[in-house]
A protein has these predicted regions:
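DNA major-groove recognition helix of helix-turn-helix/homeodomain DNA-binding modules
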Residues: 52-67
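Short alpha-helical DNA-recognition segment
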Residues: 22-41
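Residue-level signal for the short linker/turn that defines the boundary of a DNA-recognition helix
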Residues: 23, 49-52
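A short, Lys/Arg-rich alpha-helix, primarily the initiator
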Residues: 1-23
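Residue-level detection of the helix-turn-helix DNA-binding "recognition helix"
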Residues: 19, 33, 44, 73
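Residues within the helices of the helix-turn-helix
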Residues: 15, 26, 55
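The alpha-helix within a helix-turn-helix
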Residues: 18, 29, 58
């Protein structure tokens, strides 16, 4: 899996979880301490999050880290 595929999957999962939990970019930014421009970069598939960012986002969205980085059967 390359970086582009990784960003695509993470972004799609993040967008879905944000919607399920009623968060917009500004709210997620405020709750996680991640800048809004960085959250936007995640959602626009331009920035790969650090492990710390993934854990912080999972905590705020009250989900397992695996829900954000679930790649299904795509890992070879």
């Amino acid at each position: 899996m390359n970086k582009i595929e990784w960003c695509d999957i993470f972004s799609d999962n993040l967008r879905e979880l944000m919607s399920e939990h009623g968060y917009n970019q500004a709210q997620l930014s405020e709750e996680t301490g991640i800048t809004q421009s960085t959250v936007s970069g995640y959602l626009n598939k331009k920035i790969i999050p650090s492990a710390t960012a993934v854990v912080n986002i999972a905590y705020v969205l009250d989900c397992a880290v695996e829900e954000l980085i679930d790649f299904g059967d795509t890992i070879e």
